[in-house]
Structures are given as C-alpha cells and as structure tokens.
Amino acid sequence: MEWSEVEVHTTNEAVEPVANVLTEFGAAGVSIEDVADFLREREDKFGEIYALRREDYPEDGVIIKAYFLKTTEFVEQIPEIEQTLKNLSTFDIPLGKFQFVVNDVDDEEWATAWKKYYHPVQITDRITIVPSWESYTPSANEIIIELDPGMAFGTGTHPTTQLCIRALSDYLQPGDEVIDVGTGSGVLSIASAKLGAKSILATDLDEIATRAAEENITLNKTEHIITVKQNNLLQDINKTDVDIVVANILAEVILLFPEDVYKALKPGGIFIASGIIEDKAKVVEEALKKAGLVIEKMEQQGDWVAIISKRGVE
C-alpha cells in the first residue's frame, strides 16, 4: 500500500484544532513534533523512551504529521484539507507561518514514524497517560490511562486536555455521573472512570471519534462504565441530574450550549469547559453566567483557559 504524509507547520495553540481536522478527513495516525517536549524537564522514571535528538524537532512552532492511505479520493481532497486548515484562522486560532506539505511514504515508515514522538505524559501527581505499546510500571496509587494515538487525536499532550484532567481530578467524586461532550479519543471519559465516576456518557458528532473512543475505552477496561453515543453536543440528552459535564472543544462551540449544560446539571453540579483560547475566555465566561452558571475558577496553561462553573444549589 502507498501512504501519504501531510505535514503542517503551525503554532502550539493550533495543535488540537489542526489535528482534529486531519482526523476528521480520515487520517490513520497523527504525530506532534514540539520542541517543548524535548526541552522540558522530565522525571527519571520515564527513562530511555526519551532518547531523542534535538534535530528531531522544529526550531519554532509545532509540526503535525498525519498519515493517509494514498487513494484517488484523498488526492482529490488535498486542496480541501489545506483550505479547511487555513480557515481555522477565522476562529481566531493563530496558525503562525503555516506550511502545508504532502509527501509519499512507504507502509513501514508511516506505521512507526509517529510513535517516537508520543511518550508517557504525567498530567498530575497521580494520573499518567501511557502509549498502549509502552511497558510502564506505575508508582503506588498512580492512575494509568492507556491510549493509542493512531486512532484519534486526544493524547493528553495538549494543554486543553491537561487542564480538563486536572479539573476532573479536583472536582470529581466517587459515584458521580458525568457527560463528556466532544469526547474525541475518549481520554476524559477514561480519566473520569478511573477517578471513580459511576457512569459516563461520551458524545461526539464525528463517527471516527466515537469509534476511536470505543477502542480506547475497551483498551482501558472501562466499557462497563462509559457509554459512547454519536450526538451533536447535548441535543436530545434528556438528563437533569448530572454531577459533571466536561467539554474540551473550541470556545465558539461552547457558546452554543450553556443553557443545555445548566439543564443537564443537578443543583451544585460542575461544568468544566476547556479548549478556550485566552482571547475568548471573557465571552465564554459571560455566556456561562447568562445561562445561570456560577464561575468557580479559571485555570490557564500557556494561551489556553479552562473555566470551571457550577449550577447553584436551589
């Protein structure tokens, strides 16, 4: 089989939306090459899996590589893929210098190339995301989430995902009922299950994402707790007693359903909203307040913001 590698040079802020677009067009795998991963300090327990060279990484920005089976349909879609990525700037997502290149690769090369850039990611002092092919010995009480990033984007490396998982760690109580809106790879649902949630509904509009989530959920043996549903946000989700709603999606999408979140939450229930670029935080905050939610706190990592809000106790 012949494969094509789509290489996009962009900003760190654009990583998640760019990778999501590539996945939605049918990418079989996505890798992220960020110099920050090379330069940041790491604990010894991650060991030799970090034996990489500085020249493996771009001088600035981030390179995202996605792998597609080279079919006539894919070749015809290349201009559409490039234009869709460029259109992300209309959502105030900074694309930086933005370079879009398509290369041919052989079967063996694509199947392994992205793996060298994906490593265990320690999100909190007790939650670590580990590639499914890596052997990893957890410390006492450490929670391990296994993911295969070849299935869909959502590996835990992006600040928005990390902000969500940290908020879940802070607010989720054993026995809680959770809805994960825009589940992607299912990482937030899996984290919720491993933190003790009683039941989780994971929704995503994209069929590729729901299939990927189901595979990762099975990999983590949490399928008895998590139900995956292809669905548009919270439409036709007739729940009114949910403890936590979590959504790691763009600010423009979050603005579409604060009222539905309010209706779904029980009094005192928590809404964790991430995927919000700093410039959009204020407008999201105001929309949440208008829907009747009370802002608990805001957390920031780089240019990304998570807003934690609550339905008041009536």
Swiss-Prot record:
<keyword id="KW-0949">S-adenosyl-L-methionine</keyword>
<dbReference type="InterPro" id="IPR050078">
    <property type="entry name" value="Ribosomal_L11_MeTrfase_PrmA"/>
</dbReference>
<comment type="function">
    <text>Methylates ribosomal protein L11.</text>
</comment>
<protein>
    <recommendedName>
        <fullName>Ribosomal protein L11 methyltransferase</fullName>
        <ecNumber>2.1.1.-</ecNumber>
    </recommendedName>
</protein>
<comment type="similarity">
    <text>Belongs to the methyltransferase superfamily. PrmA family.</text>
</comment>
<keyword id="KW-0963">Cytoplasm</keyword>
<dbReference type="InterPro" id="IPR004498">
    <property type="entry name" value="Ribosomal_PrmA_MeTrfase"/>
</dbReference>
<dbReference type="GO" id="GO:0005737">
    <property type="term" value="C:cytoplasm"/>
</dbReference>
<feature type="binding site">
    <location>
        <position position="248"/>
    </location>
    <ligand>
        <name>S-adenosyl-L-methionine</name>
    </ligand>
</feature>
<feature type="binding site">
    <location>
        <position position="204"/>
    </location>
    <ligand>
        <name>S-adenosyl-L-methionine</name>
    </ligand>
</feature>
<dbReference type="GO" id="GO:0016279">
    <property type="term" value="F:protein-lysine N-methyltransferase activity"/>
</dbReference>
<keyword id="KW-0808">Transferase</keyword>
<keyword id="KW-0489">Methyltransferase</keyword>
<feature type="binding site">
    <location>
        <position position="182"/>
    </location>
    <ligand>
        <name>S-adenosyl-L-methionine</name>
    </ligand>
</feature>
<dbReference type="InterPro" id="IPR029063">
    <property type="entry name" value="SAM-dependent_MTases_sf"/>
</dbReference>
<dbReference type="GO" id="GO:0032259">
    <property type="term" value="P:methylation"/>
</dbReference>
<feature type="binding site">
    <location>
        <position position="161"/>
    </location>
    <ligand>
        <name>S-adenosyl-L-methionine</name>
    </ligand>
</feature>
<dbReference type="Pfam" id="PF06325">
    <property type="entry name" value="PrmA"/>
</dbReference>
